[in-house]
Amino acid sequence: MHVYAFAASVRRTLLVTYPRTASNLLVRMLSLEEQENAISNEKGGYFFWDSFIKGRTTNSTYTPIESWTPQQTEEMQQIFQHDFNRLESTSNLAESQGKVFFAKEHVQWFTDPAAISDYLSHKDSRTPSPVNIKLPNPYGTPQGFSANNLSIFPDHYLKTWRLTFLIRHPALAFPSFYRAMRELEKEEFAQTHEICPLMELNATLRWSRLLYDWCYQHQEEPIKGCDRDIQYPLVLDAQDIAHHPAVLAKYCKLIGLNPVHLKWEWNVPDQKIQKGVEDRIGHKSPEAVMKFTLDNSSHVLKDKTPAIVDIGLERKGWDREFGISIGEQMEKWVREAMPDYTYLRAKRLRVQDA
């Protein structure tokens, strides 16, 4: 099975995202709970949330791999395997019912911890992975990882998925993530020492770019030129999601979802208005922090994804909001990410394609 073989042979889609790309908005618009031909989980994905949290709470994410203790290695192996098993279980449920399986995942959450360690340590060499996902028998013997596959999944496993990508302008996504991190720190869900490495890890599109290139290189030859109007793998830009309904409708058709269920308006649950859901007295849950805008809106907020973004003008706002030091660093992250964003945006599913 290959990742971009058409509908009948690939019935599971993984939407590859990074923080603050409006992925929660996209999932709400897709109305997965009303898609009679699809199965997901209650979050529309995030199967590797527990692995992400474990990496933080054990400090494994911020510790060079060669300095991991045996306990850290064992814990991370177990949690990645556990999350993978849940992903496969839900996928198998969808397959048993003849339905499409849809999941979204931040690319950093299923990236090899060794690749993350090398990146945060600014190492050019490739450290061997401490994580070895055990695949079910139907997938056969692992056949290795190609150079630009920095995920925890071997090549032949990734080929059983239709990978699609969601991107958002770095000047919108990165400062939004920083605001969220500061709010999580305020709510005692993030520690001060985490903010810098988490920003460095997430204020880049390199992970999405590498995986996109892997997908393109490994898709079946007939698909590379079978439709001149549509480029594979599919890429969505958050700006198009908010402003061009035809693009999202086309995306639905291409991955096996029914566009009739798409939503641009919804009701706001009373208990989430203003302050969000609290998981313990006086503190919002992490989910409430990350979804605050979405949970307190009744429709798509188009002004959150403007068509034109002036980085220089945004920089002035960052200086006022974050201080000059962070404003300067934010601009550096954004400008360094722009080549990858521009590259991926040029590949996006467009209005004229729809």
Q: Can you name each region flagged by the protein language model?
A:
Residues 68-83, 145, 200-207, 322-329, ...:
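Soluble or luminal CAZymes and related metallo-dependent hydrolases
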